[in-house]
Regions:
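Early extracytoplasmic/lumenal segment of secretory-pathway proteins
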Residues: 24-87
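Extracytoplasmic ligand-binding site segments that recognize negatively charged/polar headgroups
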Residues: 31-34, 73-212
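A ligand-binding cleft/hinge motif common to bilobed small-molecule-binding domains
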Residues: 83-87, 209, 213-232, 281
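Short beta-strand->loop
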Residues: 94-101, 116-117, 145, 214-215, ...
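Periplasmic-binding protein-like
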Residues: 122, 186-191, 197-198, 229-253, ...
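A bilobed periplasmic-binding-protein/Venus flytrap-type ligand-binding module shared by bacterial periplasmic
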Residues: 127-132, 172, 246-258, 276
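Mature extracytoplasmic/periplasmic domains
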Residues: 252-309
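Extracellular/periplasmic bilobal clamshell ligand-binding domains
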Residues: 295-331
């Protein structure tokens, strides 16, 4: 009898857990796991909506969503640059929702038909270990052109466009500024100064933190975190201007928890949701002008930004990455 009672209780608990899991909002997150958890936990605390997160970088996430189109296994795609969400919209993988907060977002931070909304933005920057450059009697760079200085030979880390969307954003920035041919000429001229092309978009800031390199190129959060923690790191926004990512979210077509998916969109685009970016120390820049990113985090109007066409970015990625490998690496 005791065994039967225990078995009954165990079965009941498993049923409850399964029911709870079935009703949780399932999120495919292309935001890094640490920061995605911070934001989704804040969402749960604010709304009571439980979430289940599966981390997938942008390419695998889009492939999985497309493969599951006939039987969606997630409710929301959370993160990945907006050009990925444009592709998802074009492929019929998402559905529109006009959040009441959309009016507080500029056009670049939302789809006009409501298929995607931005979560945050991050500009590109150069992270500088001022102590190392000082010891080498090398100047602090102020521009993209400065990075070609022979004094920096073998001292710069940046991601590889073959594996990182961050590096692809660098290519797009330079194309927008200079034109395609001149952009690839610049990257070829920069190549002797590159210590290594990392696989991960955030690896350069890690190398900067441990003093492996004095110069790193990537999106700002890793640099801002190091500076906030007291490292001798300066964040430089090249004077010619920088590109930026617009990390976005979409509700997936056929979402089983549609109402809760809408709640996530509403919360993330609200003042409270945007405030969570700084409250949880993500070092991401808010997309609302009426919300501060927190101490040490710049506002968008303090940076010379270079906008790129997300549709062009989506349609030309394979070609441009292959050209980078050919022109810069000689592959």
């Amino acid at each position: 009898m005791k065994f039967s009672l225990k078995a009954t209780i165990a079965a009941a608990l498993m049923t409850l857990a399964a029911a709870s899991s079935a009703h949780a909002l399932t999120v495919y997150s292309s935001v890094d796991e640490e920061n995605a958890k911070k934001l989704l936990d804040a969402f749960t605390k604010a709304t009571g909506v439980e979430t289940q997160m599966v981390f997938l970088s942008s390419g695998p996430a889009l492939s999985r969503i497309e493969a599951e189109k006939a039987n969606p296994q997630a409710d929301v795609w959370f993160g990945a640059p907006s050009e990925n969400h444009i592709l998802a919209k074009e492929r019929g993988l998402t559905e529109p929702y006009a959040s009441a907060n959309a009016s507080a977002l500029s056009d670049e931070f939302k789809d006009k038909e409501g298929y995607w909304h931005a979560i945050y933005t991050n500009p590109l920057a150069v992270g500088v270990r001022t102590d190392i450059l000082e010891s080498r009697k090398a100047p602090v760079p102020a521009s993209w052109e400065d990075l070609k200085n022979p004094a920096y030979k073998g001292l710069i880390q940046m991601p590889s466009p073959q594996s990182s969307g961050t590096a692809y954003a660098v290519i797009l920035t330079l194309i927008q500024q200079r034109g395609e041919d001149a952009a690839f000429t610049y990257l070829k001229e920069l190549n002797p100064n590159i210590q290594t092309y990392t696989q991960s978009g955030t690896a350069p800031s890690g190398a900067l933190g441990v003093g492996e390199t004095p110069l790193a190129i990537q999106f700002t959060p890793g640099f801002l975190k190091l500076a906030d923690e007291g490292y001798p790191v300066k964040v430089v926004f090249p004077s010619e201007g920088v590109g930026y990512e617009v990390a976005s979210m979409s509700i997936l077509k056929g979402a089983k928890n549609l109402d809760d998916a809408k709640k996530l969109v509403d919360w993330m685009t609200s003042k409270d949701g945007q405030g969570a970016l700084s409250a949880t120390k993500t070092y991401f820049l808010p997309i609302r002008s009426d919300v501060s990113g927190g101490t040490g985090v710049p506002t968008l109007d303090q940076i010379k930004l270079v906008a790129s066409d997300p549709k062009f970015a989506a349609e030309n990625k394979k070609r441009l990455v292959e050209r980078w490998a050919k022109d810069v690496l000689g592959q």
